[in-house]
């Protein structure tokens, strides 16, 4: 941290701080100064990390565009297999749902009705349908 500052320079800064600030305010000033330095280091590190992340994303985009321009011909077999799986999954999502069972469904019981009430209603409905003249 103090690469260019020797022991004598640090001692001189300490003595000047003691003379200017006094023994009561010097520790408080040193703590606040170190707090500011820590905050600046954290901010610089976060900016550096964000820039590195953006550069990695840009590099990935460039690699992807380069692969697309080559027609995806020189891809490894594992990567080609995963691309095929993704295409199949996308096609299955885009397909409309198939109706498997076309038989009539019995009405379901509501929470306040018992199964016997539902059976009675369904038998009434079937008897009404069969008794109506056609």
UniProtKB/Swiss-Prot annotation:
Signal peptide: none annotated. Residues 123-134 have a biased composition (Polar residues). GO terms for cellular component: TAT protein transport complex. One of its GO terms (molecular function) is protein transmembrane transporter activity. One of its GO terms (biological process) is protein transport by the Tat complex. Keywords: Cell inner membrane, Cell membrane, Membrane, Protein transport, Translocation, Transmembrane, Transmembrane helix, Transport. InterPro entries: TatA/B/E, TatB. The chain crosses the membrane at residues 2-22. Residues 90-134 are annotated as: Disordered. It is found in: Cell inner membrane. It comes from the Bacteria. It is a single-pass membrane protein. Its main location: membrane. The Tat system comprises two distinct complexes: a TatABC complex, containing multiple copies of TatA, TatB and TatC subunits, and a separate TatA complex, containing only TatA subunits. Substrates initially bind to the TatABC complex, which probably triggers association of the separate TatA complex to form the active translocon. Part of the twin-arginine translocation (Tat) system that transports large folded proteins containing a characteristic twin-arginine motif in their signal peptide across membranes. Together with TatC, TatB is part of a receptor directly interacting with Tat signal peptides. TatB may form an oligomeric binding site that transiently accommodates folded Tat precursor proteins before their translocation. Belongs to the TatB family. This is Sec-independent protein translocase protein TatB. The gene is tatB.
């Amino acid at each position: 941290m103090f690469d260019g500052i020797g022991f004598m320079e640090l001692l001189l800064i300490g003595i000047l701080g003691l003379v200017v600030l006094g023994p009561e305010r010097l520790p408080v000033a040193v703590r606040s100064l170190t707090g500011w330095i820590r905050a600046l280091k954290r901010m610089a590190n976060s900016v550096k990390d964000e820039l590195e992340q953006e550069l990695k994303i840009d590099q990935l985009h460039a690699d992807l565009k380069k692969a697309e321009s080559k027609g995806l011909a020189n891809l490894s077999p594992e990567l080609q297999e995963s691309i095929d799986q993704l295409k199949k999954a996308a096609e299955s999502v885009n397909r409309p749902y198939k109706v498997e069972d076309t038989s009539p469904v019995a009405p379901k019981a509501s929470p306040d009705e018992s199964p016997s009430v539902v059976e009675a209603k369904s038998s009434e409905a079937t008897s009404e349908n069969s008794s109506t003249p056609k």
